Amino acid sequence: MKQKNLITVVTDHQITADTIAKAIGANEKHDGYYLGNGYAVTWTNGQLVEATFSPQESFVLSTTMESRLAYAHNFKFAMRNYDELVGYKKSAEDNRQLDTIKNLWKMSLTVVNAMRPDITGDLDFLSLYYFIGCPGDTRRAWLPVLTKKAIVHAVNHGPQNRKEYEKWLEESIYNAIVQAAEENAELKGSPTVEEISVADAAKDAECAGVPAPAPGEQREGDNYIGVITDRCPLFNLPALMIQAACELDYTHEKTILTAYRLYAKKLISYPMVMQNTIPGGVWKAMLRNMEMLRYNSRWGRSIPEGKPSKCHNFRNGETVYNGFGIVTTGLHPTDLSRDEEKLYNLIVKRVIDAFAPDSYGCGRKSKGGKKKSRRYRKEKKVKTVKTA
């Protein structure tokens, strides 16, 4: 590691590091990192550094301290060292990987945070930053999808809307501190919004012994809104876990690991824990992605005509940094294991159902009131099909 003035990218796991490294040309594989083209890419193997709430003085909610410093002020940081009762203790591998990250950090002009795209990813990176104690410029690579174009832009330019990202991060760190301190204070920021199907809401209502809610009704909690819908919602991670358990007999752990591999292979968006609506930008991307799915040998013929439904677009002011429902990326799978293929097919089916046009199944009427027959699609020019 003799190279100086590196841009070092830090991510959660080697499988995502491999995808990022290929996208930015860091093709030399070393022990614990990739190197090349002016970049180094390394990984933490999960939450390498833990944060324990331990304020140095009585916590004051009205502090004007910058959010990142407030996090450092109220938490202590140490390498993970779980109790042996649960089967884990500090390992030599962790020490080696931390040394690798430290050495790369010291040689870097900029360190890029490419941890998973949610608040836990930001907090894990901050914990690592304060534990290592190396000064330097940092940048956030927000990567809800791991396509090459998205990676190159995020690594070199950071979030598309830096001001909006900083606002979300400040509010999220504040909320994390409030929850850790168990303070009775109102949480900040826009809510997480989850669409809940009428059928699932009816089951919950039956168990609770209350009337079933109607489409359009909402459930509200701390920074949370559940919207009852008569349309098929996109998966979030919990819904995917339940469906995979029912249809594929997958354990929850197997579903989580398999979904993460599909994300790392650039086939789906990051599986968010709660949010399952989508922003306008994702809907626009799905215009193309749904067309690419038409070339899928299994699912192509089941995609209805018309533009994807907009019924899942954000409607309660939530920020894009809350994430969005699991969608496909438009790339075609080429190297999936059987388990990955089965889960991918489950996700594709849900995406097709969720984005079915609003008018699907209803014949269009002419001015005279007669239904028009559905026109056959004109033959299109053969497109180049991109693969993962």
Regions picked out by a protein language model, each given a short descriptive name:
Residues 164-185, 258, 265-349, 360, ...:
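Extended, highly charged linker/hinge segments and catalytic-adjacent loops that couple domains
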Residues 1-184:
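Intrinsically disordered, low-complexity regulatory segments
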Residues 227-244, 269-273:
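Short acidic, hydrophobic short linear motifs in intrinsically disordered regions
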Residues 160-164, 209-233:
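Metal- or metallocofactor-binding catalytic centers and their adjacent structured scaffolds
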Residues 249-264:
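Short amphipathic alpha-helical interaction segments
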Residues 24, 29-61, 178-212, 352-388:
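Structured, non-catalytic alpha/beta "coupling" segments that mediate domain-domain communication
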Residues 10, 91, 114-119, 167-171, ...:
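Conserved phosphate/pyrophosphate-binding and hydrolysis machinery centered on Walker-type P-loop NTPases
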